[in-house]
Amino acid sequence: MITDPIADYLTRIRNAIRARHRIVEIPASNLKKAMTELLHEKGYIKQYKFDDQPNKQGSIKIGLKYNPGTKTSPINKLERVSKPGLRKYVKASELPSVLNGLGIAILSTSKGIMSDKEARQMKLGGEVLCYIY
């Protein structure tokens, strides 16, 4: 049984990037789907596909993106911030800036999963799930 599904999600992506895999398959949940859509929207992953099966959990297949010349990923680090044992909540005025705007913080807000920039524009605070840069 996985006690922290977000940490598992980030670890699977991190390990696949280090092993230079093109595709990584992850057990699906609504939170992971929203995070995957955000990563695609921000250009960190190439593509994704949700394999929903009736009466089963389903999975998410993520196509990882690499620079053709240097063969490096746009994702250098995936860092879990809010953990099950210690949640990290921030107000709209205290939203973090990751690498002076070069990275993103993924937040869970009352309006759903969004990046720090979107939350700043909407003046929303929430739980800081992770940093990606």
Curated annotation (Swiss-Prot):
<dbReference type="GO" id="GO:0006412">
    <property type="term" value="P:translation"/>
</dbReference>
<keyword id="KW-0689">Ribosomal protein</keyword>
<comment type="subunit">
    <text>Part of the 30S ribosomal subunit. Contacts proteins S5 and S12.</text>
</comment>
<dbReference type="InterPro" id="IPR047863">
    <property type="entry name" value="Ribosomal_uS8_CS"/>
</dbReference>
<dbReference type="GO" id="GO:1990904">
    <property type="term" value="C:ribonucleoprotein complex"/>
</dbReference>
<dbReference type="GO" id="GO:0005840">
    <property type="term" value="C:ribosome"/>
</dbReference>
<dbReference type="GO" id="GO:0003735">
    <property type="term" value="F:structural constituent of ribosome"/>
</dbReference>
<dbReference type="Pfam" id="PF00410">
    <property type="entry name" value="Ribosomal_S8"/>
</dbReference>
<comment type="similarity">
    <text>Belongs to the universal ribosomal protein uS8 family.</text>
</comment>
<keyword id="KW-0694">RNA-binding</keyword>
<keyword id="KW-0687">Ribonucleoprotein</keyword>
<dbReference type="InterPro" id="IPR035987">
    <property type="entry name" value="Ribosomal_uS8_sf"/>
</dbReference>
<protein>
    <recommendedName>
        <fullName>Small ribosomal subunit protein uS8</fullName>
    </recommendedName>
</protein>
<dbReference type="InterPro" id="IPR000630">
    <property type="entry name" value="Ribosomal_uS8"/>
</dbReference>
<keyword id="KW-0699">rRNA-binding</keyword>
<dbReference type="GO" id="GO:0019843">
    <property type="term" value="F:rRNA binding"/>
</dbReference>
<comment type="function">
    <text>One of the primary rRNA binding proteins, it binds directly to 16S rRNA central domain where it helps coordinate assembly of the platform of the 30S subunit.</text>
</comment>
